[in-house]
Amino acid sequence: MKIGIVTGIPGVGKTTVLSKVKEILEEKKINNKIVNYGDYMLMTAMKLGYVNNRDEMRKLPVEKQKQLQIEAARGIANEAKEGGDGLLFIDTHAVIRTPSGYLPGLPKYVIEEINPRVIFLLEADPKVILDRQKRDTSRSRSDYSDERIISETINFARYAAMASAVLVGATVKIVINVEGDPAVAANEIINSML
């Protein structure tokens, strides 16, 4: 399967846009799979007793986060190999804001394993992201609850995505998630992969 990595900071709407990507691809009868990098990491972290929920993973020591990243990359790469023709999209982050600084979400040992065709940066205005976070009470995102931090994280994500892309010859594409119409971003992502 061709792999596209869809990144974006918490609250930008990655999961919503990727749900729309799946819906559109199903309508077009294109084989597809959407995987969440964090789900792979979370399953391993919970098995090892490191965390009780997804949001605790950002606060783990960096060495433990790296271990979880490697396991997730291997699992996803295997899924893509076994998936045949079609498109596989990974829902993840280009950077993770941790207490000790920004952790690359797609470091060399991850990006080379996955070898994507495109790294997408799903973005929105920081004010819009903050509003979305406030509406989503199911998640704990206090470490991203300031416009300045959101802007800083978006910039670091751009730098990190380009650095990762250089290692595997992938392209990097910024896609704006328009408020109220995830189909716009979804179609832009799909068209970049076909």
UniProtKB/Swiss-Prot annotation:
One cellular component term from this protein's GO annotations in UniProt: cytoplasm
Compartments, record wording: Cytoplasm
Alphabetized GO MF terms: adenylate kinase activity; ATP binding
Principal cellular location given in the protein's record: cytoplasm
Binding site for ATP: G8, I9, P10, G11, V12, G13, K14, T15, T16
One Pfam family cited in the UniProt record for this chain: AAA_17
Family matches, as Gene3D superfamilies: P-loop containing nucleotide triphosphate hydrolases
Family annotation (InterPro entries): Adenylate_kinase_AdkA, P-loop_NTPase
EC number(s) recorded for this UniProt protein: 2.7.4.3
Keyword terms, alphabetized: ATP-binding, Cytoplasm, Kinase, Nucleotide-binding, Transferase
Catalysed conversion reaction: AMP + ATP = 2 ADP
Superkingdom in the source lineage: Archaea
Entry similarity comment: Belongs to the archaeal adenylate kinase family.
NCBIfam families registered for this protein in UniProt: PRK04040.1
Protein name (Swiss-Prot/TrEMBL): Adenylate kinase
Source organism per UniProt: Sulfurisphaera tokodaii (strain DSM 16993 / JCM 10545 / NBRC 100140 / 7) (Sulfolobus tokodaii)
